[in-house]
Amino acid sequence: MCIRDRAINSTANVLRPSLQIIKTAPGVKTVSAFFLMMVPNCEYGENGVFVFGDCGLCQNPTSEELCVIAKSSADSFKGFTGKEPRVAFLSHSTKGSASHPDVDKVLKALELTKEQYPELIVDGEFQLDAAIVPEVAKTKAPDSEVAGTANVLIYPDLDAGNIGYKLVQRFAKADAYGPITQGLAKPVNDLSRGCTAKD
């Protein structure tokens, strides 16, 4: 197991040698990162436990890359919790409520994920509340098996993911473990320079 600490180093300085030395896992084309989020006193997700992907590495992933991120994040959730992942692709739109190329990217990622990984419980596109709040899901996405129950949240880009995890960490006082790199042949952990001793 390889753990790289960037409490004083940039992500690039940590991941460049990781990619050069460790390489990607067999069959994986996209290396990404996730956060294991543990939100206190929260009934959403898996009793407050979520995986957020990608919040630390892929700046503006394509639909194809989002598909791989979804699969890797689902596997990471299962590996850490032992629970069944329920994957939601996040967007500013829920089930066609808005039209935009950014929404199209997420819809294409969902289509690819369902084709390539039919065993995954996955759906989208969802606004956050539709993904995790059952009462909202009943109104916005009543026919979805994921809406209102998602425990793996796939962000459309790094801006949304990074802002999202930090909002939950700071406002909800959640424990945020990561970014943990996924898709490499060996585990790599890349700590934020804003990390605490507890992290």
Regions found by a protein language model. Give the residues of each.
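Conserved small/polar residues in nucleotide/adenosyl-binding loops
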Residues: M1-I3
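Anion-binding alpha/beta catalytic cores of soluble intermediary-metabolism enzymes, centered on
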Residues: D5-A147, N151-D199
